[in-house]
Amino acid sequence: MPKVALLKQDGSNVGDIELNDSVFGIEPNTHVLHEAVVMQRASLRQGTHAVKNRSEVRGGGRKPWRQKGTGRARQGSTRSPQWVGGGTVFGPTPRSYSYKLPKKVRRLALRSALSSKVNEESLLVLENISIDAPKTKEIVNILKGLQVDAKALIVLSEKDETVIRSANNLQNVTVLTVEELNILDLLMHDKLIITKDAAEKAGEVLA
């Protein structure tokens, strides 16, 4: 079982904690991580792109000249795709790009991401995070105590509005619960700060 230091929010060490081996101690699967990132990024696409076909463009689309006798190529409509102002053929239409990977694959990706944080020594486990009032300075002081000056992801076991509101003004800090954990946030933040309860909960949920 991977063993990491258990810290107070001021950065002082209070001992060690053993993490669930099947969640925090596996060999990261880079292929599955890639698949999960592609899936999540696809789900973020708006998919609102659209063009007008020949039935939707402005104008009546009358026949420009008679069928025979002019010596020119026959034309059926001034809104045919080859005409200026005509419709577009096979253009993009609004669609959803989102799709789902199997649940087992998604969980393996999360376990791989968490294990890679342990391997990189980028995981900090706190006894708990306690803030009396929602103030940005409180989170700043916690990060200073932990000597974290990079992008940080804070993971809680339950939603705590005081902590969330305290971090709202910090561009490089994101606060999530265990249920909200996702691949992009795990990989895009340099440091993962997780409470003891959240680490234990993740060990149960993702095992």
UniProtKB/Swiss-Prot annotation:
The record's listing under Pfam families reads: Ribosomal_L4
**Protein name listed in UniProt:** Large ribosomal subunit protein uL4
Describe the protein's quaternary organization and the partners it interacts with.
Answer: Part of the 50S ribosomal subunit.
Task: Tell me its family.
Answer: Belongs to the universal ribosomal protein uL4 family.
What keywords are assigned to this protein? Answer: Ribonucleoprotein, Ribosomal protein, RNA-binding, rRNA-binding
List every stretch annotated Disordered.
45-80
What is an example of a GO molecular function annotated in this UniProt entry? rRNA binding
Gene Ontology, cellular component aspect: ribonucleoprotein complex; ribosome
Question: Does this UniProt record's set of keywords contain Ribonucleoprotein?
Answer: yes
One GO BP annotation of this record: translation
Question: Which residues lie in Basic residues bias regions?
Answer: 60-71
Record function comment: One of the primary rRNA binding proteins, this protein initially binds near the 5'-end of the 23S rRNA. It is important during the early stages of 50S assembly. It makes multiple contacts with different domains of the 23S rRNA in the assembled 50S subunit and ribosome.
- Taxonomically, what lineage is the organism? Bacteria, Bacillati, Bacillota, Bacilli, Bacillales
InterPro entries associated with the record: Ribosomal_uL4, Ribosomal_uL4-like, Ribosomal_uL4_dom_sf
Could you tell me which cysteines form disulfide bridges? none
- The domain of life is Bacteria
Q: Which HAMAP family match?
A: Ribosomal_uL4_B
